[in-house]
Amino acid sequence: AGFETQITYQPVKAPAALPVRPPILCAGCMHRTAMYAMKKVFRDGIFPSDIGCYTLGIQLGTVDTTICMGASITVAAGMSLAGETRDIVCTIGDSTFLHTGIQGLINAVYNGANITVVILDNRITAMTGHQPNPTTGLTACGVATPAVSIEAVCRASGATFVETGSPNDLVTFIDVLKSARSLKGVKVIIARQPCVISEKRAKIVRGHYTVHQDLCIGCKACIKFGCP
């Protein structure tokens, strides 16, 4: 036996002018700022990417390929060695770099690729639940352990340029990207800023940002930036 219910509803048509709302990065995520800077410096570049939160950078125009963990660097190197002359800038997270990115970096250096590698180091393995990784100095059980230096690994791999910067210092970070762009070979930029979710859990309080309706001029910079 069963029963039926009568539902009364009125269909509603959405306004035609509503913008598309695709999945985006978290509010305050440093990946957004890093990718915004990348797009400003490498305007006509090619952007192979990897598996992580930063895959959502596709909405910012800085993710052209995503295949599997570690493929960003190897795809970038392959494009360079195949004769691509445009800027090739790949993105990979700190966890993924340690998982399967180091081999690709060594291969790119060994074979003479001309690429820029941006390692998005948010100090945690964020996408799968904020687990620690070898760069954090903690084991999965929270026990202190020696931390791996991404800078040291990259220099040992033979990268011609290794610099670290915070995307939150946008002007300085853009200058680092420009310096890398002016050089040949395998250049590595480590974009380091803690995951904003981890910061919130650590009770690091930030202010709330809103659009000031009286000052807004409709330039749509916030939309281009992917501001949530």
Label the predicted regions.
Residues A1-T8, A191, G207:
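Terminal amphipathic helices with adjacent charged low-complexity linkers/tails
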Residues I7-I73, A82-T85:
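Active-site diphosphate/adenylate-binding microenvironment
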Residues C53, Q193-V196:
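Short glycine-rich anion-binding loops that position phosphate/pyrophosphate groups of nucleotides
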Residues I58-V188, R201:
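Thiamine diphosphate
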Residues V196, K203-H208:
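Cys/His-rich Zn2+-binding cysteine-cluster or related metal-binding knuckle/ribbon modules and their
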Residues G207-L215:
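Generic long, charged, amphipathic alpha-helical segments
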Residues I217-P228:
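Iron-sulfur cluster-binding cysteine motifs and their immediate structural context
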